[in-house]
């Protein structure tokens, strides 16, 4: 058990018998009156957000989640199916995947996150390479400063086709590297 004052953003704790990830932490108070911690959290099982205020000496169980390398296999409406190297299949609900939906591609390797023996989400590699499937051509004379345009990238599910801001020189069919944490263009990948 850890006191609230030792819990950091990104820690997974049990609140009312539910696993919650701490997304943001604001501290108020003084050493004389005692500190309070206002946390913005997300339930790992239902993806519902929650905000709550705790005293610095409130204690919480810290949860360590299991992770296992898996490969994205297919979409079986409304579940996404992943397979490990032993051909075990894990089904994850669409709402639990979050932004990972934008980058999933058949055969993509990632890590499944398990809580209590059940796959609850996936973690993607930090950077991935994706082909640009549509991008407006650059307009001549539109080159002053850091000018960006939208580019649609390939992924497994057409309904979740995603756009990324890219420089003007990026064109359709280019392969670009993207940071999955920030959804930012990194560079053009040369083959």
From Swiss-Prot:
Compartment(s): Cytoplasm
Disulphide bridges, residue numbers: none
Organism: Janthinobacterium sp. (strain Marseille) (Minibacterium massiliensis)
Gene3D superfamilies for the chain: 2.30.30.30, Nucleic acid-binding proteins
Entry GO MF terms: translation elongation factor activity
Protein function: Involved in peptide bond synthesis. Stimulates efficient translation and peptide-bond synthesis on native or reconstituted 70S ribosomes in vitro. Probably functions indirectly by altering the affinity of the ribosome for aminoacyl-tRNA, thus increasing their reactivity as acceptors for peptidyl transferase.
Pathway the protein contributes to: Protein biosynthesis; polypeptide chain elongation
Calcium found in the keyword field: no
Protein name: Elongation factor P
CDD domains named in the record: S1_EF-P_repeat_1
């Amino acid at each position: 058990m850890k006191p609230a004052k030792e819990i950091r953003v990104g820690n997974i704790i049990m609140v009312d018998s539910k696993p919650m990830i701490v997304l943001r932490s604001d501290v108020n108070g003084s050493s004389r009156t005692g500190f309070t911690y206002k946390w913005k959290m997300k339930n790992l099982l239902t993806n519902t957000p929650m905000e709550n205020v705790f005293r610095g000496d409130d204690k919480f169980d810290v949860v360590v989640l299991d992770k296992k390398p898996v490969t994205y296999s297919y979409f079986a409406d409304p579940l996404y199916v992943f397979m490990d190297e032993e051909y075990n299949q894990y089904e994850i609900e669409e709402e639990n995947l979050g932004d990972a939906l934008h980058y999933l591609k058949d055969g993509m390797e990632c890590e499944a996150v398990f809580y209590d023996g059940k796959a609850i989400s996936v973690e993607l590699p930090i950077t991935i390479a994706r082909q640009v499937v549509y991008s407006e051509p650059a307009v001549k004379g539109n080159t002053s400063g850091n000018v960006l345009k939208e580019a649609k990238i390939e992924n497994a599910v057409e309904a979740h086709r995603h756009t990324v801001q890219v420089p003007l020189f990026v064109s359709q069919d280019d392969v670009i590297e993207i940071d999955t944490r920030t959804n930012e263009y990194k560079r053009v990948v040369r083959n």
